[in-house]
């Protein structure tokens, strides 16, 4: 998606350790118009999938998923929580994922009330690096008997292999910007097309 690539080039900051900082528009301050355009792009890509639910993971995926849902007949958005809470009652699906950004493992939890057998799920997230978070969401869907119809990612770090592995596993993955390489010293960012 050219618009997203331009924003990454203009406002993204490459940090050491393969970190791409895009908090000016994606995951701290949110550009809702950009999110709307992203949702429209995913709706076009997944238009034949009959999505009944969108699943993301807290926190950065929530805004993107909610705006995207308006392009999918306002289907419900469920976000997996990263910590147990007194607000999470009843039976739950739980798995554990390792966060590249946080450099630690954490639980991922969804109430069984909100993820059901037969749900046709679109997974949405802001970043895809090694695929650990998405594999956790896929595992939650499998536990529920839900069908993963597709995966929508804002920015994929193509050089970290998670996207390639998901494609090889047969998932319909639509990453709107795929970073092929980036250099913390020069700030250079190259995209895959």
From Swiss-Prot:
Q: Does the keyword Cytoplasm apply?
A: yes
- Protein's name according to its UniProt entry: Xanthine phosphoribosyltransferase
| A cellular component term, taken from the record's GO annotations | cytoplasm
Quaternary state and partners of this protein? Homodimer.
Q: Name one GO biological process term.
A: XMP salvage
List localization entries. Cytoplasm
- Which residues participate in xanthine binding? 20, 27, 157
Q: What pathway is it annotated to? A: Purine metabolism; XMP biosynthesis via salvage pathway; XMP from xanthine: step 1/1
Among the Pfam families in the record, one is Pribosyltran
**Protein encoded by which gene:** xpt
Q: What does the record give as EC number?
A: 2.4.2.22
Principal location class: cytoplasm
Q: Which reactions appear under catalytic activity for this entry?
A: XMP + diphosphate = xanthine + 5-phospho-alpha-D-ribose 1-diphosphate
């Amino acid at each position: 998606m050219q618009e997203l690539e331009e924003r990454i080039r203009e406002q993204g900051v490459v940090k050491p350790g393969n970190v791409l900082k895009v908090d000016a528009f994606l995951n701290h301050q949110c550009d809702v118009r950009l999110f709307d355009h992203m949702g429209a792009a995913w709706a076009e890509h997944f238009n034949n999938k009959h999505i009944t639910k969108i699943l993301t993971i807290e926190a950065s995926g929530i805004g993107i998923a909610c705006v995207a849902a308006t392009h999918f007949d306002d289907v419900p958005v469920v976000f997996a929580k990263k910590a147990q809470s007194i607000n999470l009652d009843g039976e739950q699906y739980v798995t554990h994922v390792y966060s590249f950004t946080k450099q630690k493992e954490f639980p991922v939890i969804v109430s069984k009330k909100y993820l059901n057998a037969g749900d046709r799920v679109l997974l949405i997230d802001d970043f895809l690096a090694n695929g650990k978070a998405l594999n956790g969401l896929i595992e939650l869907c499998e536990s529920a008997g839900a069908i993963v119809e597709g995966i929508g990612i804002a920015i994929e770090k193509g050089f970290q292999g998670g996207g390639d592995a998901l494609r090889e596993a047969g998932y319909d993955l639509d990453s709107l910007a795929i970073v092929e390489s980036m250099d913390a010293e020069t700030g250079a960012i190259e995209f895959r097309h």
